[in-house]
Design a protein with these regions (language model features):
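N-terminal accessory regions of S-adenosyl-L-methionine
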Residues: 1-46, 149-153, 157-159, 164, ...
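Conserved acidic residues
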Residues: 45, 105, 132
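Class I SAM-dependent methyltransferase core
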Residues: 49
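Class I SAM-dependent methyltransferase SAM/SAH-binding core
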Residues: 52-98
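Short, solvent-exposed loop/turn segments at secondary-structure junctions
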Residues: 53-57, 79-80, 113-114, 140-142, ...
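A short SAM/SAH-binding and catalytic strip from SAM-dependent methyltransferases
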Residues: 105-119
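Class I S-adenosylmethionine-dependent transferase superfamily signal
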Residues: 126
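Conserved beta-strand signature within the Rossmann-like core of class I S-adenosyl-L-methionine
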Residues: 130-144
């Protein structure tokens, strides 16, 4: 689908060839806005894709801004990192946290921060690796209740498994982010949330764009 002029309404993780999904179109075009903002007045951009699977956003980024040279770095579990490196030998893949030893123009975590048991530690590490912008998106958020843990079964997105993830209270999340010297630039609604059985409140999936406060 990326080789055509069809809409960006595709799921990077799904085998479906549908290109008119409004939710996925919103996710990718929102990312395009962030990528354009981070690359202003730049011919080359360094990007860390935290939890980026096999590197789908390497190709998506190239299609969104074709003349931008992207120094792409992706962190995920070993199986995905190894396969991604085979697919994209010019990119950089990691199965550990050694990618956090440097800074990036854009740090991007889409649908991944909530799976860190100690999400505060991960957020702090991502903030410290950010020189330009930090974009946390597809994050389950609640407003009136405390953060809680839920079980996710993402079969429709191509993952034949289930796992635990956080649903974070928005005020708590933003307070922790501010404590790491992150300035909130913009909030986004990223996607429709699946129903969570027996939850104290149903989550909404939000995105948050930050910039580090220069000290």
């Amino acid at each position: 689908n990326l080789e055509t002029t069809l809409p960006f309404g595709i799921s990077p993780e799904s085998s479906s060839e549908e290109s008119a999904n409004i939710m996925f179109h919103n996710i990718i075009i929102t990312y395009g806005y962030v990528l354009a903002l981070a690359s202003r007045q730049k011919s080359e951009l360094s990007l860390l894709d935290w939890g980026g699977g096999i590197g789908h956003y390497y190709l998506i980024s190239q299609k969104l801004i074709p003349d931008l040279i992207i120094d792409y770095h992706c962190k995920d579990v070993p199986t995905l990192a190894e396969y991604g490196q085979e697919l994209f030998p010019k990119a950089h893949f990691y199965s550990d946290e050694s990618c956090l030893s440097r800074k990036f123009d854009l740090v991007f975590a889409s649908g991944s921060l909530q799976y860190s048991q100690n999400w505060q530690h991960t957020l702090k590490a991502l903030a410290e690796a950010t020189s330009g912008y930090l974009f946390i998106t597809r994050l389950p958020i609640v407003h009136q209740v405390a953060s809680y843990v839920m079980v996710q079964r993402p079969y429709e997105y191509g993952y034949n498994t289930e796992y635990l993830g956080w649903c974070l209270n928005k005020d708590e999340f933003l307070s922790i982010a501010a404590s790491f010297n992150l300035r909130l630039i913009r909030e986004f609604i990223s996607q429709v949330s699946p129903y969570v059985n027996n939850a104290p409140a149903q989550p909404q999936y939000w995105g948050f764009l930050f910039a580090p406060i220069k000290i």
